[in-house]
Regions:
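Anaerobic metallocofactor- and corrinoid-dependent redox/one-carbon enzyme cores
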Residues: 1-242
Length: 242
C-alpha cells in the first residue's frame, strides 16, 4: 500500500484512499497493530493509519505539497475508527450509515446513532466525510433512480448539519453510472452533476467514475473515463475518484 500510494502521489494524486479489507464493516471491534494481509484491501487499524500518514508525509516533502489520506469509518465501529483517524491525522473518511443498512443488514437504530457520534468526532477533527450514494447505482439504474441519489444527499446533508459538520466537510456522493448506450446520456450525466453542484454549492462533492458498464473494451473504457473527467471539471466537483 505504501509503495502504491507514494507512486500515485508522484503521478499527481491529491488524496490516497486505502481500501478496507472485505468484511471489516461487520467486525464489532477494531484490530490492533500493523497487519500484513487483507482480502481485497487492508485492515483499518490505528497503526496502519500511522504508517500510511508517515509515508505520505515523506513523499509530500519530496514533492513539495501535502497529500491527503482517506479511509473508512462505516459498519459496526464508526466512532472508534473516526477517533483513530482523528488521532493519526487522516483528512477524509467514508462515513455513511445507509450503506450498512441497505447492503450489510446492520441494525438501523444502532448504526444511525454510531453515525451521529462519528460525525461529531469528524467535524471536530476537521475531517471531510464522504457519503456512499454511488453504491446505490450498482444495483439500481442511474437514469431511472437518479432522484434517489439526490434524496439521499439531502438526508445526509441534514444529518451532517445535526452533527456539527460544516458544508465544506460534506463530501456528498454521486456517480457517472448511466448506461453509455442511453440516448443523450452524456447530457443527462452533465445535467445531474451541475444540478448537484448548484443544490450543494459549498459542499466538497464526491464524484465517482463509471464502473457498472465497464466492459473488456479498453478503448470504450478510456472514452467513458474521459467523459467522466470532462464533466467533473466542467461542473466543479470536489473530490473526483480515479
Amino acid at each position: 500500500d505504501v509503495v502504491q500510494a507514494q507512486a500515485a502521489a508522484r503521478q499527481g494524486a491529491d488524496i490516497i484512499a486505502v481500501i478496507r479489507t472485505t468484511g471489516q464493516s461487520l467486525l464489532d471491534y477494531v484490530p490492533y497493530g500493523a497487519t500484513t494481509e487483507g482480502f481485497g484491501g487492508t485492515f483499518a487499524t490505528q497503526e496502519n493509519f500511522r504508517i500510511m500518514r508517515a509515508a505520505l508525509d515523506e513523499v509530500g516533502e519530496e514533492l513539495g505539497r501535502y497529500i491527503r489520506l482517506c479511509n473508512y469509518c462505516s459498519g459496526l465501529c464508526m466512532p472508534e475508527i473516526a477517533i483513530m483517524g482523528a488521532f493519526e491525522g487522516l483528512d477524509v473518511m467514508l462515513n455513511d450509515a445507509l450503506y450498512g443498512i441497505l447492503f450489510r443488514d446492520i441494525n438501523m437504530q444502532r448504526t444511525l446513532v454510531d453515525q451521529y457520534f462519528s460525525r461529531i468526532i469528524n467535524g471536530f477533527a476537521g475531517v471531510i466525510i464522504n457519503t456512499g450514494e454511488d453504491n446505490y447505482l450498482t444495483t439500481a439504474d442511474a437514469y431511472e433512480e437518479a432522484h434517489t441519489v439526490l434524496a439521499s444527499d439531502l438526508i445526509n446533508e441534514q444529518l451532517a448539519f445535526m452533527a456539527g459538520l460544516k458544508e465544506e466537510q460534506m463530501g456528498l456522493g454521486h456517480a457517472f453510472e448511466m448506461d453509455p448506450s442511453l440516448k443523450n446520456g452524456f447530457l443527462y450525466e452533465l445535467a445531474q452533476a451541475i444540478m448537484t453542484r448548484e443544490i450543494f454549492p459549498n459542499a466538497t462533492l464526491k464524484y465517482m467514475p463509471p464502473t457498472k458498464f465497464m466492459t473488456g473494451n479498453i478503448f470504450r473504457g478510456h472514452v467513458q473515463d474521459a467523459l467522466f473527467n470532462m464533466i467533473g471539471v466542467w461542473s466543479h466537483q470536489g473530490i473526483q475518484l480515479l
